[in-house]
């Protein structure tokens, strides 16, 4: 199967790179339909990273998924990536590559690479991280406090 057959945006076939440029852009609203193992977790966590790089505060992000397992995988992936990107001695080129994989244009990736390296520390300093929950968290919300 070619990239063009596997990825669609706005009803037309696009390359993998074009798809991730669109899908990982936090300024866009997207719907992703894909089978298990197709990379939805990668894409959703990439959107979170991109939103943080665009200036969103960690406590302003709420990711909702269907299962505890998926929520746990998303939390683990985000933590793993942030630690990896903050690792001392990680080459600047690797940070640029990671950003480009997530749809950031080359010139912008060069500029954002140092910010990506500092993202883990920024989240720790914020005190409250990104909320990644299951949709069940919405069911336990009460319209008013109990007496």
Range-by-range predicted roles:
Residues 2-142:
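P-loop NTPase Walker
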Residues 143-147:
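A short, hydrophobic C-terminal helix/tail in secreted or cell-surface proteins
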């Amino acid at each position: 199967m070619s990239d063009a057959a596997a990825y669609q945006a706005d009803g037309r076939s696009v390359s993998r790179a074009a798809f991730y440029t669109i899908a990982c852009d936090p300024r866009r609203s997207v719907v992703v339909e894909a089978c298990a193992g197709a990379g939805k977790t990668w894409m959703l966590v990439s959107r979170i990273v991109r939103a943080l790089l665009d200036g969103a505060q960690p406590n302003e992000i709420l990711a909702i998924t269907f299962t505890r397992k998926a929520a746990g995988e998303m939390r683990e992936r985000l933590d793993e990536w942030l630690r990896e990107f903050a690792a001392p001695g990680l080459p600047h080129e690797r940070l640029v590559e990671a950003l480009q994989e997530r749809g950031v244009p080359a010139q912008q990736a060069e500029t954002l690479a140092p910010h990506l390296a500092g993202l883990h520390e920024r989240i720790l300093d914020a005190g409250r991280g990104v909320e990644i929950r299951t949709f069940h968290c919405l069911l336990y919300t009460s319209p008013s406090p109990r007496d």
